[in-house]
Amino acid sequence: MAEQGSPRRFARIDRLPPYVFNITAELKMAARRRGEDIIDLSMGNPDGATPPHIVEKLVQVAQREDTHGYSTSKGIPRLRRAISNWYKERYAVDIDPESEAIVTIGSKEGLAHLMLATLDQGDTVLVPNPSYPIHIYGAVIAGAQVRSVPLVPGVDFFAELERAIRGSIPKPKMMILGFPSNPTAQCVELDFFERVIALAKQYDVLVVHDLAYADIVYDGWKAPSIMQVPGAKDIAVEFFTLSKSYNMAGWRIGFMVGNPELVNALARIKSYHDYGTFTPLQVAAIAALEGDQQCVRDIAEQYRQRRNVLVKGLHELGWMVENPKASMYVWAKIPEAYAHLGSLEFAKKLLAEAKVCVSPGVGFGEYGDDHVRFALIENQDRIRQAVRGIRGMFRADGLAPKTAG
């Protein structure tokens, strides 16, 4: 019990570090209150409208009197069948809608609840570093220990993964993967997943794959699903969210497919935690998955054009960032002249002097501290304005373009 006058302590909350992104978010809001025009390329929050046919379906179903009660925590059967059909048509994978699919309130909720359902004190989870924060802290909240696996340039990630499994005592219970990666935009081919599944089966390690950016792909490249690997469902599950593909981030709807035991575990804990997503949202999700997918291609094309503008602009400044072939992010190594600052201080500098808000790489793990992440969430004119702001900062610091990177 806390002493009188002292703050109460909550052990689970104490395990969570300060949220780095809140620091830059608060500085951004303070700057805007002062009237400064800040180009916000920080949070991966789509700025486009949800396709009209999806919105129309939501409105239509929401006007029915019989759709406003509690839904089911596993998702309505019709949506689970649509998920099954989506996998069949897209990846030639059979998913049983009754035992191998579950609807989630966005993938973030599903990931967190899956880890809460399956992990406990003493369990070890392998997570790429850097990685999307819920991949790390979902395990921490569940009480498990996280072992970071470096996902950095010049390092063979699979070899590091294999080394981590063999070197962990006790043996890891689960690995969390996400490709195309947030924040690094790193991609893998199907043969990578084949090796992962073989390794996981050899050591009996559960595999959770986050396929959030399946559709945000460029230049003819296609993102594979781990479910395409024969036997993957024996040991793996995969999450997908409608947030990015259909500009439905605020709708909070996604799904998980794969191993029936893990699907059942998630369904069981969700039956205690929630009543599922609002039924009209689920029916609208059916319209998204089963409707014309040109809208998805159009959204990806918009991101591709923004990527081109940002990468070209930074290259012209001498900041030679990688050109991603997927995701809605540019993962940029901090220019050598600023490397000593680390990602948080460099992000603060960009905000104060270039009027550009980015995500500091350290927020995704310590191995990300030499990078910042640009999210492609402003239009092309605003991205060009961001490049001009960065150019001004470089010039003020005496950096010619050729020495900026």
Annotate each predicted stretch with a short phrase.
Residues 2-106, 113, 288-291, 397-399, ...:
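N-terminal small-domain helix-loop-helix segment of the aminotransferase-like
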Residues 31-34, 142, 202-203, 317, ...:
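Helix C-cap/helix->beta junction micro-motif
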Residues 117-139:
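Conserved PLP-anchoring active-site segment centered on the Schiff-base-forming lysine
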Residues 228-229, 233-304, 308-317, 393-394:
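Conserved core segment of the aminotransferase class I/II
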Residues 286, 301-311, 321-334, 368:
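Conserved glycine-rich beta-strand-loop-beta hairpin in the small C-terminal domain of fold type I
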